Amino acid sequence: MLNDAGAEFSEEERSELLGHLHTNTNLLLTLVNDVLDLSKLESGNYSISLSNVVLPELCQSTLAGVAHRVAEGVRLELKQPDTEIILNTDAQRLQQILTNLLVNACKYTSQGSIVLAYEIAGTSIIFSVTDTGCGIDKEKGELIFQRFEKLDNMNPGFGLGLSICRSLTTLLGGKIYLDTQYTGGARFVVELPLHPPV
């Protein structure tokens, strides 16, 4: 049946249609997962599982997971301390936060670089995702963390990702914000405690 229906299209057209179908299916799946996450977070049923996380391994794995989304010619980089850092946190939730920030950076960066970095600052560890994309107006620094808030309508998405990131970061005892002083694109910062309260 599907073969018959596709007979009227050329190979190129079929490939393009399948590409659109794949993209829209992924968007729908993302929306469903985001709504489920929000529902759990709001109901207080979102549990975390703390463990000792080796940050170089987690960050390298996170970058590998988004590498296919990076525009041609854009550099994807990791900046980290020389010494290995082990953080007691929820690895899955931290990776979810960083992945979301990196995916957003990929959407809005067509040239230059996207950098994931982390460092210790006092009793906190500071992660950042910095890009050389179109940037974000500082007036939208808080607005973008609200649900269904999008920077534009040109890129796919539903405006739930950053809201979920903020809820997850709070759950991990930290905070997330847009660095409004950075003017070379966009820079998001996630601060987590080195030793989270039990």
State where each predicted segment sits.
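Short alpha-helical segment of the dimerization/phosphotransfer core of two-component systems
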Residues: 23-28
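Helix-loop junction within the histidine kinase core
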Residues: 39-50
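Conserved catalytic submotifs in the C-terminal HATPase_c
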Residues: 49-54, 73-85
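Short helix-loop "hinge" at the ATP-lid/N-box region of the Bergerat-fold HATPase_c
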Residues: 105-106
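Short conserved segment of the HATPase_c
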Residues: 136-148
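Short alpha-helical Gxxx[C/S/T] motif in the catalytic ATP-binding
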Residues: 161, 165
